[in-house]
UniProtKB/Swiss-Prot annotation:
Entry similarity comment: Belongs to the complex I 49 kDa subunit family.
Protein name in the entry: NAD(P)H-quinone oxidoreductase subunit H, chloroplastic
PROSITE patterns (UniProt xref): COMPLEX1_49K (PS00535)
Keywords, in A-Z order: Chloroplast, Membrane, NAD, NADP, Plastid, Plastoquinone, Quinone, Thylakoid, Translocase, Transport
Subunit structure: NDH is composed of at least 16 different subunits, 5 of which are encoded in the nucleus.
Source organism (scientific name): Adiantum capillus-veneris
């Protein structure tokens, strides 16, 4: 006696929230017919900490340690967008040296984030070895962060009007040495993985998103660029000093999991190119705008007197009044467009701070991609989107 697969009721399986391939506390409720996925529902909120509400009774300086807990693998980007918002709102100019230092830190953070995406993604689909390799390069990046900021993760390095401290003596040479070491390693990963027939069977044509779908779903970052859309906020919004550097947007046209992998590999190479240029062009001068701490106290330029000069070396005051305006600021994070919508009301606290996390928006398309695929493909699709639950649940 044989029963057709269509006659069997779907089996409902819960993947997560503590599944080894879930990339955090995400839960998928999956309806299966044999090995085929019939339906899928995402259950979020296991890591919700009320980050937007916390911001409403913290000054920007007090809130900076909180933002590193959104995307805790690329913390420089959350810091960058958090200080960029008040800077744009109050029209604070940052010194050129500070801008270059920020770009260097952001690109190092991008490489570290992509490396820690690459290892687990390959481990999920059966290639265990690169998972152990990527920690070599990531460790070197964290050593550079530790030398410059004092922290390996959760750096708390960016400030309104600049950065917290200048680069230490010898740091630039160390960073150039890292660039020289890292580039051949990225090519090594490509040789190990890209042409591997088992890897290609697992990723080619899996999780296909066409160009129009990617735009309609509001995707950003590698997920959008892998579908043939050349959209990178570093080119479009002209923030920091990216315009002064010579680099290209990395993109692919296929729109599948393989294309998303290739975009991230190419982005790591491009980040090293940006790093080398920024380190070479790094100007002298101050690393922080000390006028920034006198934000909105008077509309015209403040007269310096003898009393003020004794405080000239102090860091930006935590009581920066935000003008009664609203502003949306975004940066190109490793996972996509990370944005903040900030509303000031002439007080030291923001009236509202809305976070636009890339992972949360990119996660919307996952149920559509999974339907009709095999159970084993769920891990591939979810891994290729690259999500961090800290920023999804906030």
């Amino acid at each position: 006696m044989s029963i057709r697969l269509e006659d069997i009721d779907p089996v409902v399986v819960s993947m997560g929230p503590h599944h080894p391939s879930m990339h955090g506390v995400l839960r998928l409720v999956v309806a299966l017919q044999g090995e085929n996925v019939v339906d899928c529902e995402l259950i979020l909120g296991y890591l919700h900490r009320g980050m937007e509400k916390i911001a409403e009774n913290r000054t920007t300086s007090q809130y900076l340690p909180y933002v590193t807990r959104w995307d805790y693998l690329a913390t420089m980007f959350t810091e960058a967008v958090t200080v960029n918002a008040p800077e744009k709102l109050a029209n604070i100019q940052i010194p050129e040296r500070a801008s270059y230092i920020r770009v260097i830190m952001l690109e190092l953070s991008r490489i570290a984030s992509h490396l820690l995406w690459l290892g687990p993604f390959l481990a999920d689909i059966g290639a265990q070895t690169p998972f152990f390799y990527i920690f070599r390069e990531r460790e070197m990046i964290y050593d550079l962060f530790e030398a410059a900021t004092g922290m390996r993760m959760m750096h708390n390095y960016f400030r309104i009007g600049g950065v917290a401290a200048d680069l230490p003596y010898g740091w630039i040479d160390k960073c150039l040495d890292f660039c020289q070491y890292c580039l051949p390693k990225i090519y090594e990963y490509e040789r190990l993985v890209t042409k591997n027939p088992i890897f290609l069977k697992r990723v080619q044509g899996v999780g296909f998103i066409n160009r129009q779908e990617a735009i309609n779903w509001g995707l950003s970052g590698p997920s959008l660029r892998a579908s043939g859309v050349q959209w990178d906020l570093r080119k479009i919004d002209h923030y920091e000093c990216y315009d002064k550097l010579d680099w290209q947007i990395q993109w692919q046209g296929e729109g599948d999991s393989l294309a998303r992998y290739l975009v991230r590999i190419d982005e790591m190479k491009e980040s090293i190119n940006i790093l080398r240029q920024a380190l070479k062009l790094l100007p002298g001068g101050p690393y922080e705008n000390l006028e920034g701490r006198r934000l909105v106290q008077k509309k015209d330029k403040i007269d310096w007197n003898g009393f003020n000069y004794q405080f000239v070396g102090k860091k930006s005051s935590p009581t920066l009044k935000l003008p009664k305006q609203e502003h949306y600021v975004r940066v190109e994070a490793p996972k996509g467009e990370l944005g903040i919508f900030l509303i000031g009301d002439d007080s030291v606290f923001p009236w509202r701070l809305k976070i636009r996390p890339p992972g949360f928006i990119n996660l919307q398309i996952v149920p559509q991609l999974i339907r009709g695929m095999k159970l084993a493909d769920i891990v591939t699709i979810l891994g290729s989107i690259d999500i961090i639950m800290g920023e999804v649940d906030r």
